[in-house]
A protein has these predicted regions:
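Active-site bordering "gate/hinge" segments
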Residues: 1-223
Length: 224
């Protein structure tokens, strides 16, 4: 085993509950709400304990639903809720779902969001969660970008490395994340702060050149 590749956690584990309390507070978890924690066979148990403690402090009722799987980063759209009887109905009845694996492009996620359920994704390491807490002004900045992009119909992307890509947009919705799930029917990611969408079918044309510091996001999540 190459121990040089192992990342050592610097965050005091006792601070996790405080971080979750702050995050849940910004996500408007309130007294009397029901919070559903969707874990899997590899979810950090300290995250579950911290989530329970935060909900208890805020007066919310919380329970954990552990799915019998180990969801993969390289496969999206794989359902983890809905195959067992009653699980989708339970998810729809929650006020906030905290999910500890990527639920993107699943049918259950769309169903619960259409019903107004807030959904918060938590997948990063403890040290990253502390550093990536949503700062004041991030939501406003993201929504400003969201408004600009929704009016945009032609995009050109260039870089010093040689990227020169053009595409049309408007066929697919613009999705925005600002790090907290504070609005009904909103999906967010603790650590997120961006807008994203897809080009119109067949419109993308040009060259993309990767350079150090770039991130290839889903479904690969690889760093250059």
């Amino acid at each position: 085993m190459d121990h040089s590749a192992v990342r050592v956690q610097e965050l005091n584990p006792a601070k996790l509950a405080m971080l979750f309390l702050k995050q849940f507070g910004m996500s408007k978890v309130a007294k009397g709400e029901t919070v559903m924690l969707v874990s899997d066979l590899q979810t950090r148990r300290e995250f579950i304990a911290a989530a329970f403690a935060a909900c208890d402090e805020l007066g919310a009722d919380a329970y954990e639903m552990c799915v019998n799987s180990v969801p993969s980063w390289t496969k999206v759209g794989v359902p983890t809720i809905g195959q067992c009887k009653g699980t989708l109905e339970a998810a729809k009845a929650a006020d906030l779902i905290v999910v500890f694996h990527v639920p993107l492009f699943t049918r259950w996620l769309k169903d619960v969001m259409d019903g107004g359920v807030r959904v918060l994704l938590i997948i990063d390491a403890p040290d990253d969660l502390e550093q990536l807490m949503s700062p004041p002004g991030l939501k406003e900045a993201v929504l400003y970008g969201d408004g600009l992009y929704k009016k945009t119909r032609e995009v050109r992307v260039t870089s010093e490395a040689g990227t020169d890509l053009t595409y049309s947009c408007g066929e697919y919705p613009v999705m925005s994340q600002w790090g907290i799930a504070d609005e009904p029917g909103h999906f967010d990611h603790w650590g997120g702060g961006h807008i994203h969408t897809f080009p119109n079918e067949g419109s993308a044309n040009g060259t993309v050149v990767f350079q150090p510091g770039d991130i290839v996001i889903l479904p690969y999540c690889r760093y250059v």
